């Protein structure tokens, strides 16, 4: 269609050109005639982001097919850094560039993503941008796949493709599990101070709306929908909680909308996506629900162990934003429950 429209325009233009040269007065309009301009057809190619009927599964970030990634969101540093700046420590490099160099997963909603124009980039990118603005700095993001087969810290994993190559000074989107030294130590990465918690939260609808805790679920023998192969499904197995598993959080939400289950435990980060993609759902997170200790984890960022000054810069910024409530406001704006860090 595009080429047809283009060819038609060219043919018309070429056919009119000689006439214009030979008899310009014949083509000109009289002073009394209204001047009407007809715009040329224009075709813009892109994703159809209009309303959709039914439920569309959340997008999966795939670099080989994602047009935004292929158009420039690559695994290389987004700004030029000189050899001299490369030899600086992270804090001096940040000041010299006027920019914080950060890495994050290209599709980890609601935390980070390769954002389109006028669309939110993710709550962690917003937090970083707020830190930068307070110090008259910019941010530049490098997108990296954090879900590599043997973990982000394994050989060939996300750290090897980003911070270990000196392409960024901080990695967003990390969860402190307490058993991840094998991911951090080989790359000499340490965590920043945690700035929030995530965890599995209780979601109910219909006849299950009176439930307020996992004890209620167990005592009343209500079947829970759970994501398969998750810490929550392991916990349910070990504690005799009746449940049915579904592959990934969004399929648990599907099961609730379809009436297969009326109660579920899903990761708190999935609440935001569920509200966007299943607006017809009647499910709600139990008001005031706090994840049980075994099913909640701190969120933090990763930095090189040697970057003591830069770590203090980030930690101090978190302290200030936690005290003012700014992080809580950002998180809740994304439709996700906010839980303060444990530490």
Question: Language model features by range: what are they?
Answer:
Residues 101-106, 189-213, 301-304:
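Hydrophobic/proline-rich hinge and linker segments of small-molecule sensing/allosteric domains
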Residues 107-109, 118-137, 199-252, 268-270:
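Bilobed "Venus flytrap"/periplasmic-binding protein-like clamshell domains
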Residues 164, 172-185, 254-257, 261-295:
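A ligand-binding cleft/hinge motif common to bilobed small-molecule-binding domains
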Residues 22-28:
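Sec/Tat signal peptide C-region and signal peptidase I cleavage site
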Residues 49, 53-71, 75-174:
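Extracytoplasmic small-molecule ligand-binding "clamshell" domains
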Residues 194-204, 268-319, 336-343:
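Periplasmic-binding protein-like
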Residues 1-13:
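Bacterial N-terminal signal peptides that target proteins for export
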Residues 33-88, 126-134, 205-208, 215, ...:
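Extended ligand-binding regions for polar small-molecule ligands
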């Amino acid at each position: 269609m595009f080429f047809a429209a283009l060819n038609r325009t060219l043919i018309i233009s070429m056919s009119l050109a000689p006439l214009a040269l030979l008899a310009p007065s014949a083509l000109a309009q009289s002073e009394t005639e209204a001047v009407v301009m007809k715009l040329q057809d224009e075709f813009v190619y892109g994703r159809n982001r209009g309303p959709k009927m039914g439920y569309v599964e959340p997008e999966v970030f795939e670099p080989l097919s994602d047009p935004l990634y292929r158009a420039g969101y690559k695994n290389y540093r987004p700004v030029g850094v000189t050899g001299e700046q490369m030899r600086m420590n992270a804090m001096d490099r940040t000041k010299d560039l006027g920019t914080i160099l950060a890495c994050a997963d290209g599709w980890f909603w609601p935390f980070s993503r390769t954002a389109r124009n006028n669309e939110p980039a993710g709550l962690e990118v917003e937090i970083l941008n707020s830190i930068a603005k307070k110090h008259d700095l910019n941010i530049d993001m490098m997108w990296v796949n954090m879900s590599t087969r043997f973990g982000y810290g394994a050989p060939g994993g996300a750290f090897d493709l980003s911070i270990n190559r000196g392409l960024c000074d901080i990695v967003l989107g990390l969860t402190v599990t307490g058993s991840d030294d094998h991911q951090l130590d080989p790359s000499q990465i340490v965590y920043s101070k945690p700035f929030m918690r995530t965890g599995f939260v209780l979601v109910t609808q219909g006849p299950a709306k009176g439930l307020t805790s996992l004890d209620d679920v167990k005592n009343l023998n209500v079947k829970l929908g759970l994501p398969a192969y998750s810490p929550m499904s392991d916990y349910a197995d070990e504690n005799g909680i009746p449940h049915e598993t579904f592959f990934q959080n969004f399929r648990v939400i599907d099961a609730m909308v379809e009436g297969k289950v009326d109660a579920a435990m899903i990761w708190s980060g999935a609440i935001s996506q569920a509200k966007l993609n299943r607006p017809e759902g009647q499910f709600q997170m139990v008001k005031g629900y706090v994840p049980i200790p075994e099913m909640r984890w701190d969120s933090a960022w990763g930095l090189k162990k040697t970057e003591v000054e830069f770590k203090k810069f980030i930690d101090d910024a978190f302290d200030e934003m936690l005290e003012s409530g700014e992080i809580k406001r950002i998180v809740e704006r994304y439709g996700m429950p906010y839980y303060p860090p444990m530490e």
